[in-house]
Amino acid sequence: LRTHHATVRMRLVRAQVRRVLRVSAAAGGQTAFSDGFPLLLISEASLSDFNSRVSSPLPMNRFRPNLVVAGCGAYAEDQWRTLRIGETTFHVVKPCSRCKITTTDQETGYRGEEPLTTLSTYRRKQDVKAPCGDAVDVFFGQNICHQQQGRVSKGDAVYANFWQYPWYLGGYWHFC
């Protein structure tokens, strides 16, 4: 762990390994060591669109996703309800509301205003039709839960099933 002024000493503090998820849409789901959901999915196209709006592009690691998908349009993940990758099916729970941790450069430890300043101009609750969250929240990526255990490998095709709400397109979609 790097800091600007000193060495940081750390130790593992045991905590309850499993927590019940806060959103009822996660039907019986549990998480451990994560903020609120076991997995975060973001598309490369969404990051590319975001980076086209800022003067200094940010790397994907600033958003800390577990799964990164390619071959779809920007923010296509906003419309997915379930997806299958490899042997595993995932349930899309809700858009990920972003916190100040995303403003920290992981290489240097310095904090800035991005990505929250730019995301707040076009990714608020009303812009992404988020089922929960405050009007001041900004969203980037989707919180997802796996429905069963299975193997996911780099390069696997992703099959997405869309939400069937008026603001979303219906259907079944394959990419990659």
List where the protein language model places each region.
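Metal-cofactor-dependent catalytic cores
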Residues: L1-C176
